[in-house]
Amino acid sequence: MSDIAEPETHAPADDQLLIFTDAAADKVRELLDGEEGGDVKLRVFITGGGCSGFQYGFTFDETVEEGDTIIEKRGVKIVVDPVSGIYLQGAEVDFSSGLEGEQFIIRNPNATTTCGCGSSFAI
């Protein structure tokens, strides 16, 4: 038996680290249907950069690191590292399809300013 604790899985709740809408989960599941391999998850993260100081990132990942939070929605697993979780607390990830095209949208209550493109923010 290993001394390393398994990553914590959160059930949907109002105080959840990251809120993932049904539309976002459905789009991720659609994208993952074309992927081959093991248990692929969507990793949502924050990096330095962009015109406002921080920017959002998305990548598919098969690994879960110690301290990561796993959020499950409609059969899709979303992974957030502890540092990104600080900046994403209470944020909502949605998916929009319209005249402007298709895009994931993050509504972050922690952001004090955002870039016009919506991919970067400041706290």
UniProtKB/Swiss-Prot annotation:
PROSITE patterns: HESB
One BP term from GO: iron-sulfur cluster assembly
Residues holding iron-sulfur cluster: C51, C115, C117
MF-aspect GO terms: 2 iron, 2 sulfur cluster binding; 4 iron, 4 sulfur cluster binding; iron ion binding
Coiled-coil stretches: none
Keyword Iron-sulfur: yes
Cofactor(s) essential for the protein: iron-sulfur cluster
Complex and partners: Homodimer.
Name of the featured protein: Iron-sulfur cluster insertion protein ErpA
Species annotation: Halorhodospira halophila (strain DSM 244 / SL1)
